[in-house]
A protein has these predicted regions:
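Membrane-interfacial loop- and helix-cap regions that link adjacent transmembrane helices
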Residues: 6, 18-19, 24, 76-128, ...
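Hydrophobic transmembrane alpha-helices of multi-pass solute transporters/permeases
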Residues: 21-43, 47-54, 58-63, 118, ...
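Central hydrophobic cores of alpha-helical transmembrane segments in multi-pass inner-membrane proteins
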Residues: 37, 62-71, 163-172
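Transmembrane helix-loop junctions in multi-pass membrane proteins
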Residues: 38-43, 137-140, 168-177, 278-283
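Extracellular loop-to-transmembrane helix junctions
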Residues: 43-94
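Membrane-water interface regions at transmembrane-helix termini and the short interhelical loops
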Residues: 43-49, 144-151, 163-185, 243
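Alpha-helical transmembrane segments of multipass membrane proteins
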Residues: 57, 64-65, 69, 189-192, ...
């Protein structure tokens, strides 16, 4: 048939191109996932736990989180079938999982399946979905509060709903397609840190200095939870590793070390300056303690 002649032969069908990330791109995605809210909330946490003890706690939390992230990377490598090592290759080449498979879309669930079967996969999936949903709601509420401070004519809940509607289409994309947005997120985080440091180093209007509060078991426990939250985001780490080109544990480890080191530096820079400037007056959102045009610019970047 003439129509059949116009159709390409089966061996000439072009394969679907799958976008893969390198080490630098994966590191940027991890930074964008972790940094942000921690820059605004960690100053109060360090103030509640004491400046020296809080700074040490941040470093320890970063090391612990990086170690557990590395464990996840090694666990994911166990769920990926390996091809025969080719002479001259620097590492094994994992076979591509079936794109229609559920585990191809949820590598964390694949780890749970490997460890405990269907029960483990279901438990991991439920925990992952609940965690991501709660974090999403938290970030939307923070964005709504920041926008409400800039435009008080509308409520913070209104801006949270607008943000949810604007971000909803992005959830249909793969991590490999949206890694460029990580650059914008990191740029916003760097701007936010620079704004906080400038506000602390200059005579920008801010709340009066107050003596640091006494460290108690309750305040230290609250600070500990907030600091650990600043290094969270492990739920999507297996998915980020799955989008890497040649996702070996060694390559993923390089992305982890670089990203967590960058997050730690940003957290300490903004937190130490805020505590030294404001003392016990540090609020849950550090930008609420300052005012002026520079602070407004920081609110926009933080949102």
């Amino acid at each position: 048939m003439l129509g059949d002649e116009l159709l390409p032969a089966a061996d000439h069908v072009l394969p679907r191109v799958i976008v893969k990330n390198g080490i630098v791109q994966t590191s940027l995605l991890i930074i964008a996932n972790c940094a942000g809210a921690g820059i605004l909330s960690l100053p109060k946490a360090i103030n509640q736990s004491g400046l020296m003890a809080g700074s040490v706690l941040v470093v320890c939390a970063a090391i612990l989180s990086a170690y557990t992230a590395d464990i996840l990377g090694r666990c994911y490598s166990l769920t990926t079938p390996r091809k025969k090592i080719v002479e001259g290759a620097d590492a094994y080449a994992p076979e591509e999982p079936c794109e229609s498979s559920y585990f191809a879309r949820s590598p964390y669930a694949a780890i749970g399946w490997k460890a405990a079967g269907a029960v483990g996969a279901a438990a991991v999936t439920i925990s992952q979905v609940l965690t991501q949903f709660c974090v999403l709601i938290l970030f939307l509420l923070i964005s709504g509060i920041n926008l409400n401070k800039l435009i008080p004519q509308r409520s913070s809940l209104f801006f949270s709903l607008v943000g949810a509607g604007a971000l909803a289409p992005l959830m249909l994309l793969r991590p490999g397609h949206v890694w460029g947005t990580a650059i914008l997120a990191i740029l916003a985080s760097v701007i936010l840190v620079a704004v906080v440091v400038i506000l602390c180093a200059t005579d920008a209007p801010h709340d009066p200095y107050a003596p640091p509060p006494a460290v108690t078991f309750s305040t230290f426990g609250s600070a500990f939870g907030v600091i650990l939250f600043g290094f969270g985001g492990h739920a999507i780490l297996p998915a980020l590793q799955a989008t890497m080109h040649n996702p070996t544990p060694a390559r993923f480890r390089k992305a982890i070390v670089g990203s967590f080191a960058a997050c730690t530096s940003m957290y300490l820079a903004s937190s130490i300056g805020s505590v030294l400037t404001l003392g016990g007056a540090v609020g849950s959102d550090i930008l609420t303690n300052f005012s002026g045009p520079i602070n407004t610019f920081g609110l926009i970047a933080g949102t």
